């Protein structure tokens, strides 16, 4: 498949499982593109991005959320895989072919986003903001996406990038280092024996939502949080990140037990920033 074949012309409407809906909703008159990175070569969970979770392929979860957000104008899957591309198209997303060198186990997602934004700019796309939604974090909600975009575009702040975080299960002061079989606290001044309530709280970066100004994306580097980053907090129930078979089974359990549905009505967590 070629980039020309996969990058569809821009149009005011898109057919999706949610019906035909306008793509003219904007934030402060600025266009927003949702990017879903989904390569075909997962090794820990083979064919992970097209594996069914809760009745639909994993890659469709972020597509549906993007379609439900009134802030997002285009939803584009970047992939090297024909089956993923076909699944994305059938569910109302556009597709851009990812070069093989950007789809290896060692490839960085930021490089795939650089390729995508360069392709979009060459195609005449003038969007100001990009939101990345990884399929491996399926339980994000529209509120999570909109909270990141609202923080990114808040006139009272100057963030160039925003991402979702969740409270870590383990305090950073309870991490250990083991050198030649000898354990020691990972942080020199930490006391891992103190009760949990007396330990500092740490936060984990999730794969649920990243949002940034397209023109602020650095030409080099590995981080998707740059310049003055902001954070949106989300509950752990929505922050499930599927990297292993055990993670997938856990996500299935949340659905089977109805835990995800019950938690899905929670308000998006508070926002935080570096300043």
Sequence positions of predicted segments:
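Short phosphate-binding loop-to-helix
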Residues: 82-131, 139-150
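N-terminal nucleotide-binding beta1-loop-alpha1 segment
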Residues: 20-46
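Conserved core of the sugar-phosphate nucleotidyltransferase
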Residues: 111, 138-228
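Conserved alpha/beta core of the MobA/IspD/sugar-nucleotide pyrophosphorylase nucleotidyltransferase superfamily
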Residues: 27, 111, 202-275
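A short, N-terminal amphipathic alpha-helix
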Residues: 58-74, 86, 90
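Low-acidity, Ser/Thr- and Arg-rich intrinsically disordered low-complexity segments
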Residues: 2-6, 11, 16
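Conserved SAM-binding loop
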Residues: 51-52, 77, 132, 240
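Short active-site oxyanion
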Residues: 71-76, 160, 237-238
């Amino acid at each position: 498949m070629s980039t020309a074949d996969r990058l569809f012309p821009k149009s005011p409407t898109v057919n999706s499982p949610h019906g035909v809906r306008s793509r003219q909703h904007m934030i402060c008159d600025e266009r927003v593109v949702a990017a879903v990175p989904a390569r075909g070569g997962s090794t820990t969970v083979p064919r992970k991005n097209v594996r069914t979770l809760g009745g639909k392929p994993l890659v469709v979860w972020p597509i549906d959320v993007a379609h439900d957000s009134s802030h997002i104008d285009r939803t584009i899957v970047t992939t090297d895989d024909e089956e993923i591309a076909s699944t994305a198209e059938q569910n109302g997303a556009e597709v851009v072919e990812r070069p093989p060198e950007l789809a290896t186990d060692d490839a960085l997602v930021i490089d795939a986003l650089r390729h995508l934004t360069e392709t979009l700019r060459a195609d005449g796309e003038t969007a100001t903001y990009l939101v990345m939604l990884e399929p491996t974090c399926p339980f994000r909600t529209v509120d999570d996406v909109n909270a990141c975009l609202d923080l990114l575009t808040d006139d009272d702040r100057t963030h160039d990038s925003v991402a979702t975080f969740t409270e870590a299960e383990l305090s950073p002061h309870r991490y250990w280092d083991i050198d030649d079989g000898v354990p020691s606290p990972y942080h020199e001044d930490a006391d891992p024996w103190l009760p949990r309530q007396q330990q500092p709280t740490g936060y984990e970066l999730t794969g649920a939502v990243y949002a940034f100004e397209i023109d602020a994306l650095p030409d080099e580097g590995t981080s998707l949080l740059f310049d003055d980053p902001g954070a949106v907090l989300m509950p752990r129930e929505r922050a499930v990140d599927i990297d292993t078979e055990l993670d997938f089974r856990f996500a299935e359990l949340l659905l089977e037990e109805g835990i995800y549905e019950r938690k899905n009505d929670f308000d998006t967590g508070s926002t935080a920033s570096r300043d």
